[in-house]
Structures are given as C-alpha cells and as structure tokens.
Amino acid sequence: MGSNITSTSIIFLLTGVPGLEAFHTWISIPFCFLSVTALLGNSLILFATITQPSLHEPMYYFLSMLSATDLGLSISTLVTMLSIFWFNVREISFNACLSHMFFIKFFTVMESSVLLAMAFDRFVAVSNPLRYAMILTDSRIAQIGVASVIRGLLMLTPMVALLIRLSYCHSQVLHHSYCYHPDVMKLSCTDTRINSAVGLTAMFSTVGVDLLLILLSYVLIIRTVLSVASPEERKETFSTCVSHIVAFAIYYIPLISLSIVHRFGKQAPAYVHTMIANTYLLISPLMNPVIYSVKTKQIRRAVIKILHSKET
C-alpha cells in the first residue's frame, strides 16, 4: 500500500502457520488436544486448592495463582488459534489485535511474577522455616498477587498502547496465529525505535528481573541445602524445590529459545518461528499441572479425592 493508514481503520490478516495453510486442520488436532488438556489440568488444580482445606497454605495459594494465569494464557491463545485453523477466520481488527496481544503479554508476565513468588516461598521455607507462617501470611500473599497484577498493567499498557501512534502503509498480513508485538511493529512505515525501547524495557523490567531474582533465590536455597549436615535432610529439603525448578526451566528455557530464534534465526522459514511461538505459549500451561501433580503428594491426593468424589 502506498499511503498511510490510521490504526483505527486497520484490519490485520493472520496467516496461521505460514506455508502450511493446507495442513491447518491436521496441525490443529494436537494443538487443540494439548490446549484442552492444559485447561482441564489447571482447572482441576485451581478447584482443588480452593476446595480442599489441606491445601490452604502459602505454597498452594501461589500454585493456584499459577494455574489461574495458565488458564488465562491458554484461553487467550486457543480461541484465536482455533478460529484460524478450523473456521478460517483470519481477519482481526486493530483494537482486537491490541487486546489479544495485551492479554498474552500480561499472562506471560504474570506467570513470571508468580514463579518469582514461588521461588521466594521456597527460599523462606528452606532458610527460615520457623518464621515461614509469620512471613507468608494470607494478607501478604494477597498483596503479592495484587502487586503482580499492577506491575503487569503498568509495564505492559504503554508498550501496547504506543502501537496506536504508528501509521501502517505496508501489507497488513501477520505471519502468525496471534498478534505478535514485533511483527505488528514491522508493518509500520513510521519510526518504531520508541516502541522497541519501551518493549525491551518492559520485558526486561519484568521477565528479565524476575529471572535474575529467581536464579539468586535458588543459589541461596542450594547453599542452604548443602549446609545441612545429614544427607537425608538434604535430599528431603531439596525434593520440596524440584517441582518449582522444573516449572521455572519449562517457562524460561523456551522463552529464551524463542528470543534467540527470533533475533538470530531470520533465515529460518516463517513456519518455524510460528510453530516455536505457538509451542512456547502452550508448554507451560500444559506441563505445570503434570509437574505439580506428579511431584507434590498433597496435590496428587487432593486431585484423586476430587475425581473419586465425582465418580461416586
């Protein structure tokens, strides 16, 4: 297109998985199955932590926050993805695109915040167990949750809102199955350096800082565990952190890999970028319920109790 277009009049076209449009129906089958599994798993854990008195403890409150965040992320991606794959509904208005982008970014940042809170929870439990209940009171946990929401809103709203100031004069085709912030900026014919700077600042100030603090927490946890005299005590103490470490790795390793591929894998086919991005948004919501059900005895018992009660 040769002339500038105001953002409010734009209709973007989402391609889904570029180059593999003919296989969208087949691609949708595993994505749909895994997404529904993630929805059911997180719903079950959230229901268990709410209804089972034995799970009314700080660790499980944070786990319920993680499940709620994963539910939001799964719903945000599933609706648009299946609309493209099953019904070929590819057009999305600029405002809808911004809303979609905001919720995906928001729940991604919220997940990072909750993982940081869970790392802090384990640090307090391991390093200062006698004061654990005094430090992580119900009111303080609620404050942490509210602070995480406010931080996400304050950091992400400018990043998304600044897209409104841009003019768009190129093709309005987004080679993705959802509104990906860097791809939307590429369609602009105006200077996007401010947008890029704000976006990088927002993500580093949230996900980047969280990553550093989580790593510091686990370094301190490991140092505390190694200082325990008895090997049995070391094993028991460290086992309480295993599920958190796995969840942390499952969230951050794909995120870092996606960033590396996006920055340095420009020669890779477009469908590779899209499939990696879609998989990244799915893997944490899918795996977190599995990790905590397998590694946490109390969660496993609560889930089994709920399932048995429904059968009877």
Curated annotation (Swiss-Prot):
PANTHER family: OLFACTORY RECEPTOR (PTHR26450:SF408), OLFACTORY RECEPTOR 56B1-RELATED (PTHR26450). Gene3D superfamilies: Rhodopsin 7-helix transmembrane proteins (1.20.1070.10). It comes from the Eukaryota. Disulfide bonds join 97-179. It comes from Homo sapiens (Human). GO terms for molecular function: G protein-coupled receptor activity; olfactory receptor activity. GO terms for cellular component: plasma membrane. Residues 1-26, 88-99, 165-201, 262-273 are extracellular. Odorant receptor. It holds the Pfam family 7tm_4. Keywords: Disulfide bond, G-protein coupled receptor, Membrane, Olfaction, Receptor, Sensory transduction, Transducer, Transmembrane, Transmembrane helix. It is a multi-pass membrane protein. Residues 48-66, 121-143, 223-240, 295-312 are cytoplasmic. Coiled coil: none annotated. The chain crosses the membrane at residues 27-47, 67-87, 100-120, 144-164, 202-222, 241-261, 274-294. Belongs to the G-protein coupled receptor 1 family. The gene is OR51C1. It is found in: Membrane. This is Olfactory receptor OR51C1. InterPro entries: GPCR_Rhodpsn, GPCR_Rhodpsn_7TM, Olfact_rcpt, OR51/52/56-like.
